[in-house]
């Protein structure tokens, strides 16, 4: 998730968020999930397209990464179209921004928590339940564009978040497996 108007103002921000998204998709795949990665929903039109894409893909669960600020009008259409349960991933790339050298673009790359209250409220008002996983992104390196240390893979906040994500992946797999099962049952018969 991100805000389309940022891309021309802050070079590299869009690509950086897409990189984080691909990292998440790859890691969820490693946990056993089949991932349908749309990319960035950054405006209402993209939100509708994303909702149609996820709905057509018949997903069991939506992990929505709050990469930077995004307005709820861009994200709400996704979940109005695709009714799969949503888990907002409020995963910060770093534990601490290097404020002494940061820029607005750098700050926005670490502003993932900003839209979470707005999104939660919009979902609530629309009758859409959501869950939130808070923590750190869990990269094992720092991208070249970053002005701060993003190597957080071993930090407890990342380990805990990825444990929770893994539990959601397993739960979705169980639901998918059981929804395809057909059971026959013959109770006590009387002769």
List each language-model region with its residue ranges.
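An N-terminal assembly and electron-transfer interface module characteristic of large anaerobic redox
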Residues: 1-191
């Amino acid at each position: 998730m991100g805000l389309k108007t940022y891309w021309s103002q802050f070079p590299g921000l869009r690509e950086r968020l897409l990189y984080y998204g691909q990292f998440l998709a790859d890691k969820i795949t490693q946990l056993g999930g089949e991932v349908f990665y749309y990319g960035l929903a950054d405006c209402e039109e993209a939100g509708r397209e994303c909702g149609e894409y996820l709905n057509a893909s018949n997903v069991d669960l939506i992990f929505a990464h709050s990469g930077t600020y995004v307005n709820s009008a861009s994200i709400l259409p996704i979940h109005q179209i695709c009714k799969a349960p949503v888990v907002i991933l409020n995963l910060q790339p770093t534990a601490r921004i290097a404020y002494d050298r940061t820029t607005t673009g750098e700050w926005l790359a670490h502003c993932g928590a900003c839209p979470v209250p707005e999104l939660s409220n919009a979902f609530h008002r629309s009758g859409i339940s959501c869950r939130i996983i808070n923590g750190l992104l869990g990269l094992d390196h720092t991208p070249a564009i970053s002005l701060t240390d993003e190597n957080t893979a071993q930090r407890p906040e990342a380990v805990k978040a990825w444990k929770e994500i893994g539990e959601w992946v397993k739960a979705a797999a169980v639901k998918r497996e059981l929804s395809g099962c057909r059971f026959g049952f013959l109770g006590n018969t009387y002769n």
